[in-house]
Amino acid sequence: MARVGIMETAIRDGHQSLLATRMRTEDMIPILEKMDAVGYHAIECWGGATFDTMLRFLKEDPWARLREVKKRLPKTQTQMLLRGQNAIGYRHYADDVVREFCDRSVQNGMDIFRIFDALNDTRNLATAFEAVKKSGGHVQGTICYTVSPVHTVDKFAAMATEMVGMGADSLCIKDMAGLLSPMMAKALVTRIKADHPEMLLQMHCHDTSGYSEMAYLMGVQAGADVIDTAISPLAGGTSQPATETLVAALSEDPELATGLDMGLLGEIAVYFKEVRRRYWKFESNLLGIDAGVLSHQVPGGMISNLVGQMREQGQESKLPEVLLENARVRADFGYPPLVTPSSQIVGTQAVLNVLTGKRYGNVTKETKNLAKGMYGTTGQPISAEILQTILGDEQPITHRPADDLQPELGAAADEIGDLAENIDDVLSYVMFPQPAREYLQWRKEGGGPERELVAAVIGAMFVRPKKATAGQAPVLMAANGAVEQWKSYGRQRQMR
């Protein structure tokens, strides 16, 4: 019997990390039957940035994707990433929104909810925990791992115990920046499993620093039950380590073997290798190991964002200075984990501090809200000096931020009107008002068939029967007939 379970991230975090979350549902559907037969513990297929990207760029219904994927995975659990009170958006939502979103997610086919808060503030997890359990879903309480003087094994273990008391069905150590060292993985897993031997413990690591395979090995030897991996064509860099590599390595120890079908994994890898080539335009620039993250602690996606901001200002040469300032801003704010939305808040403020030449001379609204406690409490209290600089005489709140929010669903339903065909559409609108409205209007006006025709025409205008260049050839060679080739290429032109 398999001792270590594998959660496959290819159709969520794999392409989110490497291909800007652009993989379309039609490129997932053909391989799901084989993925279902592999023997995965779960397949991550939803949440994170997928919802926003589908509405904003792909003109797809996120709820329809979930239903289509679930329909093709009768043997395998589905899993998603939920940002606590932020759900799958970028701000705190009222409790009625979070409850309805969790219930509708279960009804549409979601099994396991990995629920985290960017600041590790468990008050921001409570409503989602309660809602998922009430709807019959599985609650995975999540620790956002980070490195700082205040983030110790004791602190993380205390959070795990608190989440167990809140009703978590399993626990996860989420290492979004690739900072979890092998020794810390061993220490943290050992402690949590000693405190809660009955709880399934899962590890989620990114390969940014090159630590992840070693951290996984030490973790499973210490008692971790499940690890997250991505099939090899969508692995490495800022994604997870390769599924096949970990399966093969663990198979050498009968007590750790996963029991996954390596033959099927090979076939799945061949499929996704071809799929990835269709998305060459969206390839990440961060494909290899970045050991620098071990010092500056900035996740790969956040570095891309910082580079973009500096490039817009013609100040790319100041990136090293921004990375140093990023660490200072993070320390000023009590060492929040650098994950959405705290990573964007800290990073943008660091850029402003460097470009203006005056620390906190220009403060963003989000920075002010972080200081006010509008996102929750940070790893340690923010110093009085920083609070005075940013807030003046205004006092930060001490209660749960969402307690100040009034119910939102009723007003949202009135605003979107008959563009929404059901409550799922209303939820999409609440999360992403403008992208959802544009998508729902497009759908009402006909959507699909016209888009296919336009995509084919655009593709036909740009495709040329010339010798293919490296990286682009698969886009033109992989489809089933000329029109399909044009559509594939044309869609990517539309996503610009």
Which residues does each PLM region occupy?
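Ser/Thr/Pro-rich, acidic low-complexity intrinsically disordered regulatory segments
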Residues: 466-496
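Alpha-helical segments flanking ligand/cofactor-binding loops in enzyme cores
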Residues: 33, 103, 130, 161, ...
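Active-site beta->alpha loop and helix N-cap motifs at the rims of alpha/beta catalytic domains
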Residues: 42, 47-164, 171, 178-181
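Glycine-enriched alpha-helix->loop->beta-strand junction motifs that scaffold or abut catalytic
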Residues: 39, 109-111, 135-137, 165-169, ...
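N-terminal amphipathic alpha-helix/helix-capping segment at the start of soluble metabolic enzymes
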Residues: 1-19, 66-71
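Conserved, mostly hydrophobic/aromatic
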Residues: 6, 14, 35, 115, ...
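Terminal or standalone catalytic/regulatory effector modules within metabolic enzymes
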Residues: 34-54, 285-293, 297, 301-466, ...
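Catalytic alpha/beta core domains of metabolic enzymes, predominantly
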Residues: 176-362
